[in-house]
């Protein structure tokens, strides 16, 4: 085993806050795609909540649907983003005015067409006091997957632009995060909430050798590249997965449809 530092990964943000014992602090970015059913849980975990442009429409329109027995206005007042940031080409005027009246900070970056809205939000979080106060910051991004593929590719590119920042892209079906080649990785599986399907994907550069443990089909100094072998439709077999590679890899794992109750995990 090499002398690489070990990076620990856990989807503890899918657990109720009172069951989370890690020292991780979370920031949440909501992008302009359908909200995962567990968005209220992520919101409760987060210390900083941002909407990327049209993501504010999703919070305004879709969150009340998760609570059909509660007043929609009360839900909108409860789930107020701290910041709305982006090029402001997607957010509706009525939504923008609503959150401005609630005191949400709005940052218009329509002058910057060279970065994605997710990129803009990541930069804000990296420069925030939350990031300066803790070394255990993790950024959760909903709505980063699904919809147009070029948008998805842009969001995946953000993972590679900030390899020293822990970013997790989330949809209703799965999560994706970067495993930097600078570390050996231990992934602790929340088996009641995620898996068993998973994958390790080299995007950008091939991997000459990747070694894993804890998977149905483990890799042993295996070469992976597009046009050759990539590890998709693999299965987790253990509660802890280890990964070591000479290349940055994307780790993805399915999120189960059961075991995540909105009512159980919200204030």
Curated annotation (Swiss-Prot):
Keyword Transferase: yes
Pathway as given in its UniProt record: Cofactor biosynthesis; thiamine diphosphate biosynthesis; thiamine diphosphate from thiamine: step 1/1
Expression (tissue specificity): Expressed in roots, leaves and flowers.
Any GO molecular function: ATP binding
Primary enzyme class: transferase
A single GO BP: thiamine diphosphate biosynthetic process
Pfam families per the UniProt record, alphabetical: TPK_B1_binding, TPK_catalytic
Annotated Gene Ontology cellular component terms: cytosol
Protein name: Thiamine pyrophosphokinase 1
């Amino acid at each position: 085993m090499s002398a690489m530092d070990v990076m620990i990964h856990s989807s503890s943000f899918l657990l109720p806050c009172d069951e989370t014992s890690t020292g991780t602090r979370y920031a949440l970015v909501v992008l302009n795609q359908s909200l995962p059913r567990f968005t209220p849980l992520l919101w409760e975990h987060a210390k900083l909540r941002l909407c990327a442009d049209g993501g504010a429409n999703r919070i305004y329109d879709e969150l009340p649907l998760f609570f059909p027995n509660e007043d929609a206005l009360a839900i909108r007042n409860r789930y107020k983003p701290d910041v709305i940031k982006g090029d402001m080409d997607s957010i509706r005027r009525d939504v923008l005015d609503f959150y401005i009246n609630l005191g949400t900070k709005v940052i218009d970056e329509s002058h910057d067409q060279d970065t994605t809205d997710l990129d803009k939000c990541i930069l804000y979080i990296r420069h925030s006091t939350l990031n300066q106060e803790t070394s255990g910051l993790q950024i959760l991004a909903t709505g980063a997957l699904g919809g147009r593929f070029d948008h998805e590719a842009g969001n995946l590119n953000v993972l590679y632009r900030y390899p020293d920042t822990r970013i997790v892209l989330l949809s209703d079906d799965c999560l994706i995060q970067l495993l930097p080649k600078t570390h050996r990785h231990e992934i602790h599986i929340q088996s009641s909430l995620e898996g068993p399907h998973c994958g390790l994907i080299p995007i950008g550069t091939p991997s000459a050798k990747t070694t894993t443990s804890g998977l149905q089909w483990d890799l042993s100094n295996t070469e992976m590249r597009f046009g050759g072998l990539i590890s998709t439709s693999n299965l987790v077999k253990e509660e802890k997965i280890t990964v070591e590679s000479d290349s940055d890899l994307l780790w993805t794992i399915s999120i189960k449809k059961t075991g995540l109750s909105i009512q159980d995990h919200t204030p």
